């Protein structure tokens, strides 16, 4: 975990959190981080604790974050097994159980890289999951007491300041505890509800919900549920969980007539949380579903644990099959991260350094998505730069390094930009490359500007059509910057 975290390049969100939110100032000290967290609370997100920690660890740097993130992951696994021990009273945890729970997470979490490795999303989801599991462990040990320690009240309040999925999950889970113990601790509930209200009703949550960017990306409830159930990992988790639950009931309740603990509290809470999250989210967001998915997986582990504990042949088979699957997976993952991802990141850093040293302000980088997507969706790294320079990732990357504009283009191409006069009709434009012998690779049009990526070897460009007037033409190339800049209505261009 440490090595994967350390090697993974920065994502776009991490450049956003490198600045005091809503300002042009880079975060440099704890005062900047507090002010940035306040700005985010008022303008973007009520997740006070994750927002603060994201800013803080970006200030600390990659190495401290990688160490803490690896420890967080280990804590999640360790405390999850401890939680099961508290619930069942009889289950005995072995060293092999740690491997099994890691194995299940590695293969079943829909977006492992985003949830457990990338800084911004990992702090938002896996770190808050860790806080939740620690809280549930502590809650289980003190809930039946007549008098609870004051620190659980503080802890309950802080849990409310994490994120929406944790808030929904723990509130539903507490209802199960109340029904189980037939007692209500109003101090715990009140402190949790106060923290939850501060998070949920933050001005930033409402500002984000009604922002133009969010409104553009909203999908219908039907589309969100459809996308959710189309995710391969969703169906695999649900099928395995249902199969093992039925097998467990048949074996212990129907055949052996034994009553054993069934984690219905975790399963039902996770299911309700998922239903509510899909309703409130503007679009399908797999990384936000980590907590309920994790407790589904923990339930799967529990069923497997009891089944293979009573069957040594199943235990041997599990060890052998998991070892083979992990070996094959790591044989793909290790070269991908240590060779491909690292090479692409070093290449981009080299380009960035070159552009800065040569004072180039409007520049192009390689768009590497076609290379990065050769890994499965759960473990892949992601491209953060795109053709359109106003995408927030391009915009913050530009601001971070002091560029004017940043574009991303396919390898073997250069960027051709046409800016038209206002009022131009752009529906009848025809662009011929080398007298029609070559085609543009991809294009993007916004307002009165067209962005085209064209092959590097193109020698002649001809712009045909009527009803428009060209204001400016540019060509930008890798390592060269702007190689052509014409401020005339010219229709035919010869290139060297």
Which positions does each model-derived feature cover?
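Transmembrane catalytic cores of multi-pass membrane glycosyltransferases
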Residues: 5-67, 119, 154-272, 279-288
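Transmembrane alpha-helical segments
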Residues: 73-84, 129-143, 171-179, 242-250, ...
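Membrane-interfacial loop-to-transmembrane alpha-helix junctions, especially the N-terminal start
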Residues: 90-100, 148-149, 184-190, 257-269, ...
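Membrane-interface micro-motifs in multi-pass membrane enzymes
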Residues: 95-140, 163, 236-241, 273-303
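Signature aromatic-anchored transmembrane alpha helix within multi-pass, membrane-resident enzymes
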Residues: 149-151, 193, 306-331
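Intrinsically disordered, polar/acidic, low-complexity terminal segments
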Residues: 1-44, 58-76, 84-94, 322-496
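Hydrophobic membrane-spanning alpha-helices of multi-pass integral membrane proteins
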Residues: 264-274, 294-298, 320-327
């Amino acid at each position: 975990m440490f090595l994967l975290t350390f090697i993974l390049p920065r994502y776009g969100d991490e450049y956003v959190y490198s600045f005091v939110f809503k300002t042009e100032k880079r975060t440099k000290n704890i005062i900047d981080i507090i002010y940035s967290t306040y700005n985010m609370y008022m303008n973007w997100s009520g997740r006070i604790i994750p927002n603060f920690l994201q800013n803080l660890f970006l200030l600390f740097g990659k190495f401290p974050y990688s160490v803490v993130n690896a420890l967080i992951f280990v804590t999640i696994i360790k405390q999850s097994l401890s939680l099961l021990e508290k619930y069942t009273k009889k289950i005995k945890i072995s060293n092999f159980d740690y491997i099994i729970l890691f194995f299940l997470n590695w293969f079943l979490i829909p977006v492992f890289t985003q949830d457990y490795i990338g800084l911004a999303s990992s702090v938002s989801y896996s770190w808050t999951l860790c806080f939740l599991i620690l809280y549930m462990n502590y809650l289980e040990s003190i809930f039946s007491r007549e008098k609870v320690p004051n620190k659980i009240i503080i802890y309950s309040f802080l849990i409310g300041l994490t994120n929406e999925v944790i808030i929904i999950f723990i509130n539903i889970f507490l209802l199960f505890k109340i029904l189980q113990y037939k007692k209500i601790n109003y101090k715990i509930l009140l402190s949790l509800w106060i923290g939850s209200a501060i998070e949920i009703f933050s001005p930033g949550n409402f500002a984000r919900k009604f922002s133009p960017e969010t409104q553009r990306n909203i999908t219908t409830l039907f589309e969100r549920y459809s996308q959710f159930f189309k995710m391969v990992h969703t169906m695999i988790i649900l099928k395995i969980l249902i199969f093992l639950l039925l097998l467990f009931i048949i074996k212990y309740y129907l055949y052996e007539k034994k009553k054993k603990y069934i984690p219905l509290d975790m399963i039902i809470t996770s299911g309700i949380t998922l239903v509510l999250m899909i309703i409130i989210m503007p679009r399908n967001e797999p990384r936000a579903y980590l907590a309920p998915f994790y407790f589904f997986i923990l339930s799967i582990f529990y069923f497997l644990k009891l089944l293979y504990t009573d069957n040594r042949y199943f235990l041997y088979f599990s060890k052998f099959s998991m070892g083979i699957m992990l070996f094959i997976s790591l044989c793909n993952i290790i070269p991908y991260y240590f060779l491909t991802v690292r090479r692409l990141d070093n290449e981009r850093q080299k380009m960035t350094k070159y552009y800065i040293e040569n004072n180039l302000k409007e520049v192009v980088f390689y768009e590497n998505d076609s290379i990065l997507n050769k890994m499965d969706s759960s473990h892949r790294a992601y491209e953060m730069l795109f053709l359109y320079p106003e995408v927030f990732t391009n915009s913050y990357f530009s601001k971070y390094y002091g560029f004017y504009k940043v574009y991303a283009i396919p390898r073997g191409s250069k960027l051709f930009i046409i800016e038209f006069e206002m009022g131009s009709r752009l529906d009848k434009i025809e662009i011929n490359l080398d007298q029609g012998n070559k085609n543009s690779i991809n294009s993007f049009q916004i307002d009165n500007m067209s962005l085209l990526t064209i092959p590097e070897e193109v020698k002649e460009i001809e712009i045909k059509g009527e009803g428009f007037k060209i204001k400016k033409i540019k060509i930008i190339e890798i390592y060269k910057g702007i190689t052509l800049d014409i401020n005339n209505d010219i229709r035919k261009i010869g290139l060297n």
